[in-house]
Amino acid sequence: MRIPEAVIFDMDGVLIDSEPIHIGIEKQLFDKLGIDVSATVHRSYMGASNEFMYSDLRSRFKLSESVSELIESDELFRSDYFHRLDTIPANDGLISLLGQIKTAGLKLAVATSSSPEIANLLLNKCGIASFFDAIVTTSEAGKSKPSPDVYLLAAQRIGVLPEDCIVFEDSPNGLSAAKSAGMFCVVIQSDNEIIKELSGADYLIQSFTEITLTRLTDLFAINQIVD
């Protein structure tokens, strides 16, 4: 029976329940820019990088600021906000699952669209940074999700073949990235409005409390047989 060698996690909305915070921050930033971004358009940026989001917004709303200026303003605002937080809670059941994975000797990585500074800040404030063998961002990979680049780079960094990785995601962009990388993908369904866009997931859960490493390994093995 083939078993997984690594588990790679998206960060926002998966490891940490930070998506509502990011959405609130972005709404404040959009207000400062004087633009009215619909919920549908805003939702389409889930899992994507700031470069992707601001390139689209600049084109859509004919903004005068350059993409680099928009990103710089965004990252300063986010960094200031998160620095003022004492701690950030991990999602329910996460610490137990990370412990199981670590004890079993599997590699662990993060593949996120957040900037390196924000990613390290949040993971440290959440108290889980030490679990991971690699933290990889889309800015390092060169392309935003739904491109598979960040997942392929994460697998390379931890020395594991893509097909031997399990991914945890929560967005359509992230799911597309993981599947395009040839990885088994479990999706945490946190937004009922995008459930149809998550139909390509190998497995759906509501919370980490529903899953164990043993169950993950079984699902991975069954998927290999079916494929």
Residue ranges and their predicted role:
Residues 1-43, 193:
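Active-site neighborhood of HAD-like aspartate-dependent phosphohydrolases
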Residues 29-61, 67:
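Alpha-helical substrate-recognition element adjacent to the catalytic core
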Residues 58-96, 104:
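Metal-dependent phosphoesterase signature
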